[in-house]
Amino acid sequence: MATFTDAEIDDLFETSGTIIDSIITAQGKPVETVGRSAIPQGKTKALSAAWEKHESIQPPASQDTPDRQNRSDKQPSTPEQMTPQNSPPATSTDQPPTQAAGEAGDTQLKTGASNSLLSMLDKLSNKSSNAKKGPWSSLQEGHHQLPTQQQGSQPSRGNSQERPQNRANAAPGDRGTDANTAYHGQWEESQLSAGATPHALRSGQSQDNTPASVDHVQLPVDFVQAMMSMMEAISQRVSKVDYQLDLILKQTSSIPMMRSEIQQLKTSVAVMEANLGMMKILDPGCANVSSLSDLRAVARSHPVLVSGPGDPSPYVTQGGEMTLNKLSQPVQHPSELIKPATVGGPDIGVEKDTVRALITSRPMHPSSSAKLLSKLDAAGSIEEIRKIKRLAVNG
């Protein structure tokens, strides 16, 4: 985006102001035709004759001709720019006043059709030339014109003093003709040159500012401040969103680790369940417990003690004796306490009972569990029993 300094912005505002003023003060375009002359047909000879007559009665150049020449350098001269304002004092005294007034009236009627058109073309050409040169060049031309106007102010004052005397000697018809044929541009020029202090030209641009070329003028930048404030607000909001996104990413980065830890926990719990399934807590009186729910159900049954003397008759022998075991529990048959002497080593019966309980507790197919039980019954050594146990655990 292009940036401008304060001086350049001021120049742009001033040039736009001068252009707006020129557009507002511009006069309307005359009636235009396409491919045809603006002069009506049949009036060309009359206009040329009027121009020749005007040239024949034109007085010699006065002392204010340098000012006119300087003005004609800026604007292209047309037949109607040559004012007939000085013509009434310079008319010959040989002609009667009525004849001079009649000729001037005929000239005005003949040239009236093209006066407005030519004056409008002159104004448009002056404005187009000023627009091409730029306001700075018009100011320089105005400065060049000021000395010439100051030099021509003294002679013009002399002419202005002589004009009332000549007009006083002229006829009343000449006065009316003079008022009708006076040219506005020449009258404005005489007003500028009259007086001790010359009239200051209006400046379309401040002289202290740097001139700006019309060819390189860019668009005004009034909306830059609003755009900058909007961009700053948007950048702040974007930074806040970025910070929140960073926090969210930091929090979500731990999700894969949590998932992996949860998977590991599930795996470890499954392994522990398998180990608990293989490791059976066997109650001496309840060897058929095969699940944790059954074990809990057995644990809910509590022994009940009956206070007071019991009935010892079942445990008293005929001789009035009672046999107690190692736990001081009464035994009905004393032969139960007498165990035969066995060779030291593992008991095959206990091993068989343990493996049989393991086979029945495992969730296996009934045919495979029946085969293992048949092999267990036929086993006669500890090694065979252990092989059957491995098959039950693995299968």
From Swiss-Prot:
Positions with biased composition (Polar residues): 75-98, 146-168, 203-212
The entry's family comment says: Belongs to the rubulavirus/avulavirus P protein family.
Q: What is this protein called?
A: Phosphoprotein
What UniProt notes about the protein's domains is:
The N-terminus consists of a long intrinsically disordered tail. The central part contains the coiled-coil multimerization domain (PMD). Forms a four-stranded coiled coil structure. The C-terminus constitutes the alpha-helical domain that binds to the nucleocapsid (N-RNA complex).
UniProt entry keywords in alphabetical sequence: Phosphoprotein, Viral RNA replication
Its source organism is Newcastle disease virus (strain Chicken/Australia-Victoria/32)
Q: Where is this region: Disordered?
A: 31-109, 126-214
Annotated region described as Multimerization, given as residue ranges: 222-285
Biological function: Essential cofactor of the RNA polymerase L that plays a central role in the transcription and replication by forming the polymerase complex with RNA polymerase L and recruiting L to the genomic N-RNA template for RNA synthesis. Also plays a central role in the encapsidation of nascent RNA chains by forming the encapsidation complex with the nucleocapsid protein N (N-P complex). Acts as a chaperone for newly synthesized free N protein, so-called N0, allowing encapsidation of nascent RNA chains during replication.
Q: How does it assemble?
A: Homotetramer. Interacts (via multimerization domain) with polymerase L; this interaction forms the polymerase L-P complex. Interacts (via N-terminus) with N0 (via Ncore); this interaction allows P to chaperon N0 to avoid N polymerization before encapsidation. Interacts (via C-terminus) with N-RNA template; this interaction positions the polymerase on the template for both transcription and replication.
Alphabetical list of InterPro entries matching this protein: P/V_Pprotein_paramyxoviral (IPR004897), Soyouz_module (IPR025909)
According to the UniProt entry, which residue ranges have a biased composition of type Basic and acidic residues? 65-74
